[in-house]
Amino acid sequence: PIVLISFETGGVRLHEANAGLLAHAECMDMLQTLRGRVPVVAMIGSKIGCFGGMGFVAAATDIIVMSESGRLGLTGPEVIEQEMGRSEFDASDRALVFRTTGGKHKYIVGDCNYLIADSLTAFHQQAALIADLPWPQIEAMRRIGSEAKVRAQMALTKKISESEPSDARDVWAMAGNTAPQSLVDMDLETFLSNVKRLPVEEA
């Protein structure tokens, strides 16, 4: 058995924030209960993406599968622009939005385990492959669930923060990609063959 969750959400409405936070916590608690019993896979490939508190829920699953057009984050682009100003983040700049929240970026920084083609067939095939994985391999792909993982994530966050990146491409360069701009327009197969990812587990 395997649990597949297709995330397509911008988060809860602000006037339902408290109830939404409680629901998120309950979902994450249930995901921890399922840990080691049934693989739970987040699938993100819609036009809306996965934002708000549901970003936390997605992060609590065992594995995240994204297409290049999928987006994942906590605060959505429009809210960032509203709160910080367009000079800080222009939500109408699609290239910027996808460099920051899109599948390629999330794959490089380790938030996404598998980056696949933008088709239902690709998602079905990836789910079938995941269903056959041994538990130790699935457990190793989790983003949360142990003090060691927390320490690794915090170390990576500190490293990135100290570098003061002004764009996602600066983070890609930190991962060892010597020509980060070239990754933007690469087709999926070429991208996966050439990209270097941040070594979260070694951070």
Q: Where does each model-flagged region fall?
A:
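Amphipathic alpha-helical segments at domain termini/boundaries
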Residues: 82-203
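A structural preference for short, pocket-lining loop segments at secondary-structure junctions
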Residues: 1-13
